[in-house]
Amino acid sequence: MTEKKHKNSLSLVHSIKEELKKDKLAMISTIFLVAVFLIVYIYSMFLKQSNYVDVNIMDQYLAPLTTGHLLGTDNGGRDIIMMLMISARNSFNIAFAVTLITLVVGNILGVITGYFGGRFDLIFMRFTDFVMILPSMMIIIVFVTIIPRFNSWSLIGIISIFSWIGTTRLIRARTMTEVNRDYVQASKTSGTSDFKIMFREIWPNLSTLVIAEATLVFAGNIGLETGLSFLGFGLPAGTPSLGTMINEATNPETMTDKPWTWVPATVVILIVVLAIIFIGNALRRVADQRQATR
């Protein structure tokens, strides 16, 4: 069994490599994303909180290419490159955390409901239908407003309340297909426990789909966090994010006369999300190919 899983994992890695070789855009996107994450996290490790919290009025709104400030400064006299790195790190951290929770909850619930089916599955799906029709953005904003001592973990928890639904339904649908395959029926006949069948036999066969779903969920969470921060309902005051940088554009004067304060963050979000989507589409094709050949 261990040898078989090892071969499957090698086959998965090989399939992904081959797809990236064929899809040059996805390959370039992968290299770009790795470079962005390395630069953002390594750079931010050497910054102190005072670097992006302290205000220097004397350096307010310095134009790009000013000595010591390649992309200029913002309304607090803070270097745009520095703020871009810190903001990107904070936005990525929120997106990573929500994506992790989404995948864990979505995979567990999706596999369980898809495997057992029946009345439990019917009731659970009606519950997810109800959650999906709720105005999630408005509810998130209300929670952000009323929760005392709101912080980053609060935001992660609030977003995660609604984020797992789509992943759960996707994993459930694929699990229901796997349940009818011969290897599952053979395991049931041999007396293998339901837990082992679900998470040691069925779930590994969903790995490509899970990876593809993770990339797209991550891109969506970056967009959601950015949107909330742009509206003023994201990360708490004093914690910069890409959304708070773009919020500078809400001032008409700043939008037209000082575009360097918000354009860099907009470009980063656009390129990063597009790169993640290109990678996710390539991984989705790998998942579909592996499913078709089984």
From Swiss-Prot:
<comment type="function">
    <text>Part of the ABC transporter complex OppABCDF involved in the uptake of oligopeptides. Probably responsible for the translocation of the substrate across the membrane.</text>
</comment>
<feature type="transmembrane region" description="Helical">
    <location>
        <begin position="27"/>
        <end position="47"/>
    </location>
</feature>
<feature type="transmembrane region" description="Helical">
    <location>
        <begin position="127"/>
        <end position="147"/>
    </location>
</feature>
<feature type="transmembrane region" description="Helical">
    <location>
        <begin position="94"/>
        <end position="114"/>
    </location>
</feature>
<feature type="transmembrane region" description="Helical">
    <location>
        <begin position="260"/>
        <end position="280"/>
    </location>
</feature>
<feature type="transmembrane region" description="Helical">
    <location>
        <begin position="202"/>
        <end position="224"/>
    </location>
</feature>
<comment type="subunit">
    <text>The complex is composed of two ATP-binding proteins (OppD and OppF), two transmembrane proteins (OppB and OppC) and a solute-binding protein (OppA).</text>
</comment>
<protein>
    <recommendedName>
        <fullName>Oligopeptide transport system permease protein OppC</fullName>
    </recommendedName>
</protein>
<dbReference type="InterPro" id="IPR035906">
    <property type="entry name" value="MetI-like_sf"/>
</dbReference>
<keyword id="KW-1003">Cell membrane</keyword>
<dbReference type="InterPro" id="IPR050366">
    <property type="entry name" value="BP-dependent_transpt_permease"/>
</dbReference>
<keyword id="KW-1133">Transmembrane helix</keyword>
<keyword id="KW-0571">Peptide transport</keyword>
<keyword id="KW-0472">Membrane</keyword>
<keyword id="KW-0614">Plasmid</keyword>
<dbReference type="GO" id="GO:0055085">
    <property type="term" value="P:transmembrane transport"/>
</dbReference>
<dbReference type="GO" id="GO:0015833">
    <property type="term" value="P:peptide transport"/>
</dbReference>
<dbReference type="GO" id="GO:0005886">
    <property type="term" value="C:plasma membrane"/>
</dbReference>
<comment type="similarity">
    <text>Belongs to the binding-protein-dependent transport system permease family. OppBC subfamily.</text>
</comment>
<keyword id="KW-0813">Transport</keyword>
<feature type="domain" description="ABC transmembrane type-1">
    <location>
        <begin position="88"/>
        <end position="280"/>
    </location>
</feature>
<keyword id="KW-0812">Transmembrane</keyword>
<dbReference type="Pfam" id="PF00528">
    <property type="entry name" value="BPD_transp_1"/>
</dbReference>
<keyword id="KW-0653">Protein transport</keyword>
<dbReference type="GO" id="GO:0015031">
    <property type="term" value="P:protein transport"/>
</dbReference>
<dbReference type="InterPro" id="IPR000515">
    <property type="entry name" value="MetI-like"/>
</dbReference>
<feature type="transmembrane region" description="Helical">
    <location>
        <begin position="151"/>
        <end position="171"/>
    </location>
</feature>
